[in-house]
């Protein structure tokens, strides 16, 4: 049954809001309905008596979020996500900046993707974990706004950057004779991406308040909750709906169309052109592997963020009520998308594998000094080559391209530019 207005006054007396100012985590709640200065009567009447009873009995923010099993699982999951995300995305930036031949617009976009993942890993994920463990927000007003902004801004930057990568790959493969996006233009596009992401993220970050609730003399909790301007219900609903459509569904639609056309070109086109069959097939394998890698990145991003986006959208539409365990599980699943990309790059890109091996070798015990080793009867490669050629380089066995240029399965993020136009 719905809560009578008279009973609302009694319930309000048992939960006293002692302070108001600041951000929201991602799940609005009954506290916002109780204390929000602009909470509408429709929103208040949307809960049953059982809902309000559970809230006053502190089940909503107490026992539900303190389930030991759920807490332990999410602590481990969040911790692994933070460690792997930071290590992997820093490695991505290191590899691209270190390799001169990887300096291209596509590589800049991939670095931008890694930077967005690092931002959300540092400014949102740890704070959300602590909020879940303590059932209260302990970082103050400033970080409440910053954490909320980081989550939305990183999501928007990632979606827009993946769209830019898809458009760039479409341009390179569908129109190989046209000039590619230069590094300067790539920097400009990245700047535009961040401006757009900031613009769409600020409403979520600004419309937040830090509410402090006194349940008893010993139990006081602070919560980051949304506090949208009037009409609050409609503002919240349409803001989340616009965000979901413009910065999640629309980018994924553009990406899908771009990669579908690229796949049709690569998998169905059989024109060889003025190159050998071996060179042509090697080039196609390289481009196919690159496209597969980028498509896999997009698919994982879409799958990881879909549950949380749907949850927030349904919540703002009042189709469901809040659920702590469900929200934090969806939030972790979305945050886990930040640590998958580096593993995909290392799996499908030789440059990343080489750099990872080099970093791991630095952590191993250094070899023994040269004088402690027994002399080898076999001369080194350099000595043997010099003695054999007498200072002259041996001729190549044939006139084909070096095998390193025609190996299959090696992906170069910046070398998808075809040698020949394919019809």
From Swiss-Prot:
Residues in the Cytoplasmic compartment per record: 93-107, 168-186, 261-293, 349-423
CDD domains: 7tmA_GPR83 (cd15389)
Residues covered by region (Disordered): 389-423
Induction statement: By glucocorticoids and cAMP in T-cells.
PROSITE patterns, alphabetized: G_PROTEIN_RECEP_F1_1, G_PROTEIN_RECEP_F1_2
UniProt KW keywords: Cell membrane, Disulfide bond, G-protein coupled receptor, Glycoprotein, Membrane, Receptor, Signal, Transducer, Transmembrane, Transmembrane helix
Name of the protein in its database record: G-protein coupled receptor 83
Disruption phenotype: Deficient mice have normal body weight and glucose tolerance when fed a regular chow diet, but are protected from obesity and glucose intolerance when challenged with a high-fat diet. Knockdown of GPR83 has minimal impact on anxiety-like behaviors in female mice and a decrease in anxiety-related behaviors in male mice. In contrast, a local GPR83 knockdown in the basolateral amygdala leads to more anxiety-related behaviors in female mice.
Signal sequence residues: 1-17
Transmembrane segments: 72-92, 108-129, 146-167, 187-208, 239-260, 294-315, 328-348
Biased composition (Polar residues): 401-414
Record localization: Cell membrane
Keyword field contains Cell wall biogenesis/degradation: no
Glycosylated position list: 38, 46, 134
One cellular component (GO) term of this entry: plasma membrane
Annotated function: G-protein coupled receptor for PEN, a neuropeptide produced from the precursor protein, proSAAS (encoded by PCSK1N). Acts through a G(i)- and G(q)-alpha-alpha-mediated pathway in response to PEN. Plays a role in food intake and body weight regulation. May contribute to the regulation of anxiety-related behaviors.
């Amino acid at each position: 049954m719905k809560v009578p207005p008279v009973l609302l006054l009694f319930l309000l007396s048992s939960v006293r809001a002692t302070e108001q100012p600041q951000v929201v985590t991602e799940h609005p709640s009954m506290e916002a309905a109780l204390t929000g200065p602009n909470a509408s009567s429709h929103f208040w009447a949307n809960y049953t008596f059982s809902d309000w009873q559970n809230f006053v009995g502190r089940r909503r923010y107490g026992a539900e979020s303190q389930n030991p099993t759920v807490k332990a699982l999410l602590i481990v999951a969040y911790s692994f996500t933070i460690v792997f995300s930071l290590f992997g995305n820093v490695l991505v930036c290191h590899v691209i900046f270190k390799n001169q031949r990887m300096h291209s617009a596509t590589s800049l976009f991939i670095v931008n993707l890694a930077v967005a993942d690092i931002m959300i890993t540092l400014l949102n994920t740890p704070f959300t974990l602590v909020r879940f463990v303590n059932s209260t927000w302990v970082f103050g007003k400033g970080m409440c706004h910053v954490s909320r902004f980081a989550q939305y801004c990183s999501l928007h930057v990632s979606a827009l950057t993946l769209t830019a990568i898809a458009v760039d790959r479409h341009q390179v493969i569908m129109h190989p004779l046209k000039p590619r996006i230069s590094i300067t233009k790539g920097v400009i596009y990245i700047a535009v991406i961040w401006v757009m992401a900031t613009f769409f993220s600020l409403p979520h970050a600004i419309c937040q308040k830090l509410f402090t609730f006194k349940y008893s003399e010993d139990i006081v909790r602070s919560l980051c909750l949304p506090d949208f301007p009037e009409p609050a219900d409609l503002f919240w609903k349409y803001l989340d709906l616009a965000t979901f459509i413009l910065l999640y569904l629309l980018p994924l639609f553009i990406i899908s169309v771009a990669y579908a056309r690229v796949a049709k070109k690569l998998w169905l086109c059989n024109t060889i052109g003025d190159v050998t069959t071996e060179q042509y097939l090697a080039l196609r394998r390289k481009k196919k592997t690159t496209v597969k890698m980028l498509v896999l990145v997009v698919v994982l991003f879409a799958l990881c963020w879909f549950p949380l986006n749907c949850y927030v959208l349904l919540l703002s539409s009042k189709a469901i009520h809040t659920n702590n365990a469900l929200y934090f599980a969806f939030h972790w699943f979305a945050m886990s998308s930040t640590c998958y990309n580096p593993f995909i790059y290392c799996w499908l890109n030789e440059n990343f594998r080489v750099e990872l091996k080099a970093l791991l070798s630095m952590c191993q015990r250094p070899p023994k000094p040269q004088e402690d080793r027994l002399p080898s009867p076999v001369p080194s490669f350099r000595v043997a080559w010099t003695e054999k050629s007498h200072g002259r380089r041996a001729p190549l066995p044939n006139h084909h391209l070096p095998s390193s240029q025609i190996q299959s399965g090696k992906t170069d993020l910046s070398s998808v530019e075809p040698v020949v136009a394919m019809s």
